[in-house]
Amino acid sequence: MKYNSVIRKAIFLRRPNRFQAYVVLDDEELLVHVPNTGRCREILKEGCTVLLRKGTTPNRKTPYDLIAAYKGEILINIDSQIPNKVVEEALINKKIEKLVNFNNISREKTFGNSRFDFKLQDDNENIYFLEVKGVTLEENGETRFPDAPTERGKKHILELIEIKKLGMGAGIIFLIQIDNVNKFSPNDETDPKFGEALRLAKKEGVDIFAYNCKVTEEEIELLNPVEIVL
């Protein structure tokens, strides 16, 4: 998907809280919005180059959103709203092999006590629930999720297991918002319970996908599946 707004480059200074950051744009210090509540400590370091997207709401306190950052030569998209849009585009364009038969795509559907990112249905009325997780934590070509403990993430996985037991399809896709990575694993060091739940889900037949992305200063799109090591 292409960014449908003005993109500017800036220099990252600091992040006083989860939702805001200070950058230097056109030689002036500016407060911007960070659309990602994760820590991103390995990415947002003082002096790194970041990408800003012009906000569409007039008169808001932060005129730009900080949507991506360079980690050395690697551009990482950190906008938490992007993964669902990228996956939806991939589903429509039949880029996820196991899900190509699902033509009916619905967003934000509830089952049990959870709301899932996608509810899919094929021509035979088979139902499949799909949850999307954006991945930004990378080291030496290997990626992990989450970068902070996530009780909600574990809850989603356990609900997917129940969906599978009821005879419906269930899957979780880790969208790695980075190019040139070759492996994905749960971050057991940060959240061992999430890793335990993911391994249980695999055992119970829940599909686990991990895809990297083509990330440029103009667009981001789903690229290739990567190795999953549980």
Curated annotation (Swiss-Prot):
MF terms in GO: DNA binding
Coiled-coil segments: none
CDD domains: SfsA-like_bacterial
InterPro entries for this protein: SfsA, SfsA_C, SfsA_N
One protein family per Pfam: SfsA
Family the UniProt entry places it in: Belongs to the SfsA family.
Protein's name in the database: Sugar fermentation stimulation protein homolog
Annotated source species: Clostridium perfringens (strain SM101 / Type A)
Taxonomic lineage of the native organism: Bacteria, Bacillati, Bacillota, Clostridia, Eubacteriales
